[in-house]
UniProtKB/Swiss-Prot annotation:
Protein's organism: Homo sapiens (Human)
One Gene Ontology CC term in the entry: nucleus
Record's protein name: Zinc finger protein 621
A GO BP annotation: regulation of transcription by RNA polymerase II
Taxonomic classification: Eukaryota, Metazoa, Chordata, Craniata, Vertebrata
Pfam families registered for this protein in UniProt: KRAB (PF01352), zf-C2H2 (PF00096)
CDD domains (UniProt xref): KRAB_A-box
One Gene Ontology MF term: DNA-binding transcription factor activity, RNA polymerase II-specific
Length: 439
């Protein structure tokens, strides 16, 4: 955005011009004169392309274009040339080259000291060419208005006073976010925003939580943090009912239902619905390992891996078995250990109505007469409860329900199932899955 007042910073052809006296011009050989003319014409073309308004052609350029000698009366005041700089260093007077240089914000004119800087004409021309490139930085966005430099965005035409402001603005068009948080990988357009965000992780922000004293970088971050203490989860998924404290986590969860994957790796084209997983995946290609152990220097791509590694040094064992009290560093080892302890076996509940042969019905279960699709009569049993039971195929389309414990063997019953099967079809034994006993 253009401001109403700007510091004056004049840039003209005179700032990059070199003048010779008649004697100086006579001392140059043809190759040096040709090089001089080439550089001056190039300087003039560069300045003319950058200035936004027309200006008179300098006499020096007119002489060079006509092939005339460019020398003439000394363009600088001879009284000034006889002066001594404030630092006590003599400036070029009659011998050597006379140069006009921009030396301060007010663009005061000074003379270039000899000081061994320019040892020959060719070296001097090369120096002036480099100085011109540094002055304008060959920036295609640079424009000059009224002798002042501005930087214009080619996308939207917005004008800025400083090139750094333009570069930051251009990120809004490209979407580039070069500054990343080392803790969570979140990216930002400016280093300031990244620094403010990182204070959330270390608890040094200006907004302090009254519950735990942690400092947050913004009022919004404080509000989200306080939900940890209150247990509030205002964002609820309409699909499954799961609730979340943060809207970002809620939106990320929604992608599990929609199957949407916004983040695609440009290296291998693998897509992710979660930004954090996408960031971790990219480290496979870049080799980046931002989490480094302070004890041994080992680095990791994920924060959780770094936390687990710390237990090697601290000896922490957070996973404790409730049966025997043994503790483990790793969750995987804890799960494997749990398998060593016998799991409490719950009684099996066989849900009815089951078709049972009336000849073998148990006296403990009152039979109820049903009309089946088969010609033989059958008895419906509302439920049969056994600690364990196995269905064993027998001849024909009958199965034996054999309890393994808890009921005398005399209570074995013949169960009619799959009445449409032929006698040759004998399914394999089926073990019933245990379920909780209903009252």
């Amino acid at each position: 955005m253009l401001q109403t007042t700007w510091p004056q910073e004049s840039v003209t052809f005179e700032d990059v011009a070199v003048y010779f006296t008649q004697n100086q011009w006579a001392s140059l050989d043809p190759a040096q004169r040709a090089l001089y003319g080439e550089v001056m014409l190039e300087n003039y073309a560069n300045v003319a392309s950058l200035v936004a308004f027309p200006f008179p052609k300098p006499a020096l350029i007119s002489h060079l274009e006509r092939g005339e000698a460019p020398w003439g009366p000394d363009p600088w005041d001879t009284e000034i040339l006889r002066g001594i700089s404030q630092g006590g260093e003599s400036w070029i007077k009659n011998e050597g080259l006379v140069i006009k240089q921009e030396a301060s914000e007010e663009t005061e004119l000074h003379r270039m000291p000899v000081g061994g800087l320019l040892r020959n004409v060719s070296q001097h021309f090369d120096f002036k060419r480099k100085a011109l490139k540094q002055t304008f930085n060959l920036n295609p966005n640079l424009i000059l208005r009224g002798g002042m430099k501005f930087y214009e965005c080619k996308e939207c035409g917005k004008i800025f006073r400083y090139n750094s402001k333009l570069i930051r603005h251009q990120m809004s068009h490209t979407g580039e976010k070069p500054f990343k948080c080392k803790e969570c990988g979140k990216a930002f357009k400016s280093s300031y925003d990244c620094i403010v965000h990182e204070k959330n992780h270390i608890g040094e922000g200006p907004y302090e939580c009254k519950e735990c004293g942690k400092g947050l970088s913004s009022n919004t971050a404080l509000t989200q943090h306080q939900r940890i203490h209150t247990g509030e989860k205002p964002y609820e998924c309409k699909e499954c009912g799961k609730a979340f404290r943060r809207s970002a986590a809620y939106l990320q969860h929604q992608r599990l239902h929609t199957g949407e994957k916004l983040y695609k790796c440009k290296e291998c084209w693998k897509a992710f619905g979660c930004r954090s997983l996408f960031i971790v995946h990219q480290r496979i290609h870049t080799g980046e390992k931002p989490y480094q152990c302070k004890e041994c220097g080992k680095a990791f791509t994920q924060k959780i891996a770094s936390i687990q590694h710390q237990r090697v040094h601290t000896g922490e064992k957070p996973y404790e078995c409730k049966v025997c009290g043994k503790a483990f560093k790793w969750y995987g080892s804890f799960v494997q250990h749990q398998k060593l302890h016998p799991v409490e076996k719950k009684p099996v509940k066989v849900l009815g109505p089951s078709l049972v042969s009336p000849q073998c019905s148990s006296p403990a279960i009152p039979p109820v007469l049903l009309q089946g699709s088969c010609s033989a009569s059958a008895v419906a049993v509302p439920s049969l409860t056994f600690p364990h039971a196995v269905l064993i195929p027998t001849s024909g389309n009958f199965f034996m329900l054999l309890p393994t414990s808890g009921i005398p063997s005399s209570s074995a019953q013949i169960v009619r199932v799959f009445q449409g099967l032929t006698p040759t079809v004998k399914p394999s034994p089926v073990i019933l899955t245990p379920s909780s006993h209903s009252s």
